[in-house]
UniProtKB/Swiss-Prot annotation:
Pfam families: ATP-synt_B. The gene is atpF. It comes from Campylobacter concisus (strain 13826). It is a single-pass membrane protein. The chain crosses the membrane at residues 3-23. This is ATP synthase subunit b.
């Protein structure tokens, strides 16, 4: 009995909830139209959109590859420059060592030549001194002898002649 009462009480609600015959919602047809439109759109626009997207991917990949190539080239150049700098440092050190050795050798050579020149000058001085002494001695002897031989009044014996020569020489 209670079910019958509930049925009669719910009947007006069910009557108002039913269709009045005025508005008909066509959700199924609209959904099918949308899906059909989307399928046609995908069919015609998918290939150009996919090609556009793929060309963009290719451009980015090419740009990335060119950047990586430039990076590799710059690294190779950097390594080459670093090698050259290291070689230049080694060459500079070798040149410095060679210059130091040459300076030492040149100083020794100049010193040796100076010593040889000094020895030659001293030798020349001694020879010149001896030559001048002999020349002076000859001159003195010639002068004494010419004095002795020019004056006939003076007769000198050998001892006196030696004494006179010794006095003139000293």
């Amino acid at each position: 009995m209670k079910i019958k009462i509930l049925f009669f009480l719910a009947l007006p609600f069910l009557a108002y909830a039913s269709e009045h015959g005025g508005t008909n919602y066509d959700i199924v047809e609209r959904t099918l139209n949308f899906l059909l439109f989307f399928a046609i759109l995908v069919y015609f626009a998918a290939k150009p959109l996919k090609a556009l997207y793929q060309s963009r991917i290719d451009r980015i990949a090419n740009k990335l590859e060119s950047i990586q190539e430039k990076l590799r080239e710059s690294k190779a150049k950097k390594d080459d420059v670093l090698k050259r700098v290291e070689e230049a440092k080694q060459n500079a050190n070798a040149l410095i060592e060679t210059a130091k050795k040459e300076a030492v050798n040149l100083a020794a050579k100049v010193k040796k030549e100076a010593q040889n020149d000094i020895a030659n000058i001293e030798k020349g001085y001694k020879e010149q001194k001896e030559f001048e002494e002999r020349k002076m001695t000859k001159g003195v002897v010639n002068e004494i002898l010419s004095d002795i031989f020019s004056s006939d009044s003076l007769k000198v014996d050998q001892k006196e002649l030696v004494n006179i020569i010794l006095k003139k020489v000293s």
